[in-house]
A protein has these predicted regions:
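"…together with the soluble PPM/PP2C metallo-phosphatase catalytic core" -> "…together
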Residues: 1-179
Length: 179
């Protein structure tokens, strides 16, 4: 309760930087993201129950990533210390987004072999993204969803540390990587 209250006070104090009223603008992206997760989860549940070939799982990841890119969630520019591409071509943007989603999904999945590693990294990533979303004035739905993910992972971590009592499985680790 105390942590929830502190979080709520922080969000309320930063309300002038958070975009509260743009949910209408993001509904297509949100539905695309949720449908992409649904597709990946379907493939991974089958993999958790009955092992499927890696190419089949990769196909599911590609389908999910394509759905996300088609919904409008894209890497539209790259700004790094030595690379500054504020706008990239639309086809390059779509391909880069699909590749990024599949690569990160598989990276988190591969890290799931050690107790608490993928969950711990996902918590750090989620908290970092939450701070970035708040500072950049992202839509409130983005802040709420990433905070919910971080909170769920913080609650899960004690059960996933050595000796682990609960595991993510392919469905959980692919969900974290995809998210």
């Amino acid at each position: 309760f105390l942590i929830s209250t502190i979080y709520l006070l922080i969000v309320m104090s930063m309300e002038h930087t958070i975009n509260l009223f743009d949910f209408q603008q993001y509904w297509k992206k949100l539905l695309g993201f949720l449908f992409g997760i649904l597709i990946i989860s379907a493939f991974c549940v089958v993999d958790d129950i009955k092992t499927i070939k890696p190419i089949t799982k990769l196909t599911g990841q590609l389908i999910g990533a394509i759905i996300v890119a088609a919904s409008g969630i894209r890497i539209e520019g790259i700004t790094l210390p030595f690379i500054n591409l504020p706008e990239i071509h639309e086809i390059t943007s779509v391909l880069l987004t699909i590749a990024w989603i599949v690569i990160v999904t598989n990276a988190i999945n591969l890290m799931d072999g050690l107790d608490g590693l993928s969950s711990g990294i996902a918590v750090i990533s989620a908290i970092s993204l939450m701070v970035i979303f708040v500072l950049n004035g992202s839509a409130l739905i983005s802040v709420v969803l990433i905070t919910a993910l971080a909170g769920a992972l913080v609650g899960f971590l004690p059960f996933n540390f050595t000796p682990a009592k609960t595991f993510l499985g392919d469905t959980g680790s692919n969900f974290l990587g995809f998210s």
